[in-house]
Amino acid sequence: MDAVTPKKDIPRPDSVRRPSQQEAEEAVRTLIAWAGDDPAREGLIDTPKRVVNAYKEWFEGYGEDPVKYLSRTFEDVQGYDDIVMLRNIEVESHCEHHIAPFIGKAFIAYKPSTAVVGISKLARVVEIFAKRLQTQETMTAQICDAITESLAPMGTAVFIEAEHQCMSTRGVHHKHVTTITTQFTGVFKSDADLRNRFLNMCGQTV
C-alpha cells in the first residue's frame, strides 16, 4: 500500500512577545494578592520566582521543534514489515482552559514505508507537545501529524488516556474519570483489523 501523503506544515504557536522574568514574577504576585494573601510575607516571598521557574519547565515545549527529532531516519530494517509501537509513554500536560494539569499515558504506532526513527525520538515528540498549553484532542492530532509529516509512513496511530484535574479538583469534582482520544491515518484508518490490533495493544477490548 502506498505511503500516506504527509501534511506540509504542522501548526505551531504564533509568535508572541515573551514577558521578562521580572514581569512574570510580578504577575504571580498579583495573583497571590488577588487570592487574598500577602506576597511579601516570609512563606511567599520567593514563590513568584519558583512559579516562573516551574513554568519554564512545564512549558519548555514551545522552544522545541518536534520535526527536528524525527529528521534522522534509518532505512536498513532487514525486511521488517510490521508496525512499530511505543506503549505507556508518560504524559504530563496542562489544559489551556484552566492551566490545570492533565496526566496520563500515550500509545503511538506507525507502519514504516521506507524508514524508521529511533524510538526515543517518538517519546520526545510526545513530550514536546505535552509541554505546551493544550487540549488533549489537539495534542493527539499534533503528535499524529508530526509523525506522518516526518516519516511518511503507511499509517500512524495515536491513543491517549488522561485524567484532567480541571474536572477532578474543581467544577464537577469527578475523580478518576479519564478521557480517551485517538487519531488514525493510512492503514490504521482503512484496515479495521490493524486498528483493532493497535487498540487491543493499548489495553482496549474491541
From Swiss-Prot:
Pfam families: GTP_cyclohydroI (PF01227)
Residues binding Zn(2+), per UniProt: C95, H98, C166
Reaction equation(s) it catalyzes: GTP + H2O = 7,8-dihydroneopterin 3'-triphosphate + formate + H(+)
InterPro entries associated with the record: GTP-CH-I_C/QueF (IPR043133), GTP-CH-I_N (IPR043134), GTP_CycHdrlase_I (IPR001474), GTP_CycHdrlase_I_CS (IPR018234), GTP_CycHdrlase_I_dom (IPR020602)
GO biological process: one example: tetrahydrobiopterin biosynthetic process
UniProt superkingdom: Bacteria
Enzyme class, broadest EC rank: hydrolase
GO cellular component: cytoplasm
UniProt cross-references to SUPFAM superfamilies, sorted A to Z: Tetrahydrobiopterin biosynthesis enzymes-like
Annotated EC: 3.5.4.16
Subunit annotation: Toroid-shaped homodecamer, composed of two pentamers of five dimers.
Protein name: GTP cyclohydrolase 1
Species this chain originates from: Hyphomonas neptunium (strain ATCC 15444)
